[in-house]
């Protein structure tokens, strides 16, 4: 949660192996999915409960008369179970995203992991689970870094690929330097045995690649 340009910003976490998946598999009630009988049903269940991170902003939170909550990145509809056995149908969420879909348009972004204000901008680091989700294109791998320039502007992508290392699946921390010369990113990287793998710190400066 970060305060920026007159608003409070926050994001959500939705890990792929979530409690929702476990509950839908084990529940025997008619409104639950139940145990998948085949790979097709397992895929339907996995897709039905999967969620990417949503991103929100609140204003005037202390005054219920003027309080404003905005969904910046999210969905106006999401799958719900189970109007018919082993099926998901779409249901309205009651929200309309101001700027775009969940995950900042990247389905693998499951978690808005960190944020920091630097040089008048709001920087946002994600946890991108794409590399753990099976075969995909390498272009989708690696944590995202996003930037918001003002309360009137959408997020702009700074990097899609783990700040140069696709095995960096998360930007775990962002910390501006006290002298204002840059911002330090602490990465999450599970590939500690890979050449060049493991935990990293990245120094980000204006104009640097």
Q: Where are each of the predicted segments found?
A:
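Surface-exposed loop and turn segments in beta-propeller and other repeat-based domains
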Residues: 61-107, 153-166
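Short catalytic/ligand-binding loop motif for oxyanion handling, primarily in non-cytosolic enzymes
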Residues: 17-21, 80-82, 131-134, 191-194
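Signature of short aromatic-glycine-proline-rich micro-motifs recurring in repeat-based ectodomains
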Residues: 1-3, 15, 42-53, 85-119, ...
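Blade-level signature of beta-propeller repeat domains, shared across WD40, Kelch, NHL, RCC1
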Residues: 118, 123, 171-208
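Beta-propeller blade signature
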Residues: 23-64, 136-152, 196-208
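Extended non-catalytic domains of envelope/secretory-pathway proteins
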Residues: 7, 11-12, 24, 69-72, ...
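Ankyrin-repeat and related helical/solenoid repeat scaffolds used for protein-protein interactions
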Residues: 135-138, 142-183
